[in-house]
From Swiss-Prot:
Activity modulation: Competitively inhibited by xanthine.
Residues annotated with N-acetylalanine modification: A2
The protein's name in its UniProt record: Uricase
EC number: 1.7.3.3
Keywords: Acetylation, Oxidoreductase, Peroxisome, Phosphoprotein, Purine metabolism
PROSITE patterns: URICASE
GO BP terms: purine nucleobase catabolic process; urate catabolic process
Catalytic activity: urate + O2 + H2O = 5-hydroxyisourate + H2O2
Modified residues (N6-succinyllysine): K10, K23, K220
Sequence similarity: Belongs to the uricase family.
Length: 303
């Protein structure tokens, strides 16, 4: 028969590993008006705080709790007074506020996603106040800071869906009694990029670096516009993106990438007396292959 403790505060058999509380998905649209020229940042922000005391968990004592509604209001007010130059800077502002304003907060963790609005543009002329939603990659960041420590800053790209109709293959893999997959020299390659990297310090043009990483991802996936670039595996493309990124962007310390292999299969039309030469394909959402990898700069040799 199971035995239960009535006094959880005196339970010596468990210990806290990590605690936190906060507010998720606090949405803000910030408008910067410079005369008739307007700029916008729409974000969704999630904040988690860790407190020095655990008395709220142990005894139901809420005297140290900053209400999550207050956290939401703080995000709104910081957007007003600090603006949102970049989502990374905004996340650091939020961390700094809670750590400097409340001595019993020991850790602040802030995640921000930016809605992908792009200014209307035609023939090189930019509209002064109109924007279009362009879901060609979501900019996100993750900033964590402990008391008396520097902010640990990650940025990333997600929901960047790309496809090429050739210059991809998959050959030379292990074949056993359960293998039915044929080798292919030419196939469609489609994926939805998730990419996350860590900065070495905070003195970075975050917007420019994010754009540079996105350009590298597209460059290594697609190759030259007139002929493309062959990919022998998703793994090779993933690694090539990482190596080029770290070689060109010294402010980045490490990079994680996840590339699902989204399948498009040739539809068999032989029963209808037709030959389908990879012209009509069937998209399959799942199951799908998933390839991941993280690289970092090597530490200098001590020899």
């Amino acid at each position: 028969m199971a035995h239960y403790h009535d006094d959880y505060g005196k339970n010596d058999e468990v210990e806290f590993v990590r605690t936190g509380y906060g507010k998720d998905m606090v949405k803000v649209l910030h408008i910067q008006r410079d005369g008739k020229y307007h700029s916008i940042k729409e974000v969704a922000t999630s904040v988690q705080l860790t407190l020095r005391s655990k008395k709220d968990y142990l005894h139901g004592d809420n005297s140290d709790i900053i209400p999550t509604d207050t956290i939401k209001n703080t995000v709104h007010v910081l957007a007003k007074f600090k603006g949102i130059k970049s989502i990374e800077t905004f996340a650091m502002n939020i961390c700094e506020h809670f750590l400097s304003s409340f001595s019993h907060v020991t850790r602040a963790h802030v995640y921000v996603e930016e809605v992908p609005w792009k200014r209307f543009e035609k023939n090189g002329v930019k509209h002064v106040h109109a924007f279009i939603h362009t879901p060609t990659g979501t900019h996100f960041c993750d900033v964590e800071q402990v008391r008396n420590g520097p902010p640990i800053i990650h940025s990333g790209i997600k929901d960047l869906k790309v496809l090429k109709t050739t210059q991809s293959g998959f050959e030379g893999f292990i074949k056993d009694q359960f293998t039915t997959l044929p080798e292919v020299k030419d196939r469609c390659f489609a994926t939805q990029v998730y990419c996350k990297w860590r900065y070495q310090n905070r003195d970075v043009d975050f917007e420019a670096t994010w754009g540079a990483v996105r350009d590298i991802v597209l460059k290594k996936f697609a190759g030259p516009y007139d002929r493309g670039e062959y990919s022998p595996s998703v793994q090779k493309t993933l690694y090539d993106i990482q190596v080029l990124t770290l070689s060109q962007l010294p402010e980045i310390e490490d990079m994680e990438i996840s590339l699902p292999n989204i399948h498009y299969f040739n539809i068999d039309m032989s029963k209808m007396g037709l030959i389908n030469k990879e012209e009509v394909l069937l998209p399959l959402d799942n199951p799908y292959g998933k390839i991941t990898g993280t690289v970092r700069r090597k530490l200098p040799s001590r020899l």
